[in-house]
């Protein structure tokens, strides 16, 4: 972890000197550490110059994975501390798990308002499989997960599935100056020459994207990276990426639906049997999702565009 944090700090600050100051170590010590890392890998991770350090191609690949590991470790430490603190507090507890979603924050806020006497903790993981395994031995009380269409999750025996949405379309994120960004709906063929960015650590995402691209008869280059790397590359026009339709607006990125909605996921709340919080959790999850759908302009328009779409989310 120390090596990964050092690499991330150098990339974030743009120089070994500033990274050393941020990490609280001497510049020579950090320089030596970087050299040892590069020697162990057999290649340089950064270009050094008068203007600072820039990641090499290999460096960008390593950093895309390193950030995920560092962020996951930070979440793990925070959750472990919260768990340790909670063990010393009496009263009801609710251990919530979730894959990455724009609605999790609002969902937790609503849950805490609904159950003010309950100590609610959150575990976030990119892998739905990990969360489902935590539910099976009752390490989690419930988990909100998504299942990529065509890549069914292996739900452990005994768990109860509550479907929030049978088919949520996945939209595409583009740079504002991308030619397809001017259209209300984007065809896959319009993205055949773009680099596609996917997160291989998300269960089923790469397989789902690969199937859809193959069915469309296109074979664009594919990059693997985490959310932060994806967002920066999309904003710079270096890639396009599938995204949740509830994604909020950004000045440096536009969100558009794909024609005929070829990419989709199923949204599930999974609980052990006889979970007393299942009903309230599902109701507040539905409310949080509907609120997010209303805030996301392209998704709201998509929901209003055809009668067979889940208009109940909009109160219809």
From Swiss-Prot:
An annotated Gene Ontology molecular function: DNA binding
Entry annotated with the keyword Protein transport: no
Keyword GTP-binding annotated: no
One GO cellular component term noted in the UniProt record for this chain: protein-DNA complex
Disulfide-bond pairs as recorded: none
InterPro entries per UniProt: LysR_subst-bd, Tscrpt_reg_HTH_LysR, WH-like_DNA-bd_sf, WH_DNA-bd_sf
Pfam family, one: LysR_substrate
Domain HTH lysR-type: 1-56
UniProt keyword annotations, A-Z: Activator, DNA-binding, Transcription, Transcription regulation
DNA-binding region: 16-35
Record-linked PROSITE patterns: HTH_LYSR
Family indicated by similarity: Belongs to the LysR transcriptional regulatory family.
Described function: Transcriptional trans-activator of the gene (mprA) for the small neutral protease.
Name of the protein this chain belongs to: Small neutral protease regulatory protein
Species: Streptomyces coelicolor
Recorded name of the encoding gene: mprR
């Amino acid at each position: 972890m120390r090596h990964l944090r050092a690499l991330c700090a150098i990339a974030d600050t743009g120089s070994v000197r500033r990274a050393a100051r941020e990490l609280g170590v001497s510049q020579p010590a950090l320089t030596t550490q970087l050299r040892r890392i590069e020697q162990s890998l057999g290649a340089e991770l950064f270009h050094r110059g008068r203007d600072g350090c820039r990641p090499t191609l290999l460096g960008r690949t390593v950093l895309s994975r390193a950030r995920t590991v560092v962020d996951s470790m930070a979440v793990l430490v925070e959750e472990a501390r919260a768990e340790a603190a909670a063990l010393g507090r009496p009263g009801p507890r609710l251990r919530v798990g979730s894959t990455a979603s724009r609605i999790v924050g609002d969902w937790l806020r609503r849950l805490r308002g609904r159950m003010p006497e309950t100590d609610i903790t959150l575990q976030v993981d990119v892998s739905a499989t990990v969360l489902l395994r935590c539910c099976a031995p009752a390490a989690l009380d419930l988990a909100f997960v998504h299942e990529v269409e065509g890549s069914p999750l292996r739900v452990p025996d005994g768990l109860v599935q509550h479907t929030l949405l049978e088919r949520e379309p996945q939209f595409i994120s583009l740079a504002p100056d991308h030619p397809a960004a001017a259209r209300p709906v984007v065809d896959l063929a319009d993205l055949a020459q773009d680099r596609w960015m996917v997160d291989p650590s998300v269960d089923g995402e790469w397989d789902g994207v690969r199937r859809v691209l193959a069915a469309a008869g296109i074979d664009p280059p594919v990059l693997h990276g985490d959310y932060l790397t994806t967002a920066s590359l999309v904003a710079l026009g270096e890639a396009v990426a599938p995204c949740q339709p509830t994604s909020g607006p950004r000045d440096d990125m536009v969100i558009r639906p794909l024609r005929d909605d070829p990419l989709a996921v199923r949204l599930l709340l999974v609980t052990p049997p006889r979970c007393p919080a299942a009903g309230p959790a599902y109701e507040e999850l539905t409310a949080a999702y509907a609120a997010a759908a209303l805030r996301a302009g392209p998704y709201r328009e998509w929901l209003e565009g055809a009668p067979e779409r889940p208009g109940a989310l909009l109160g219809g």
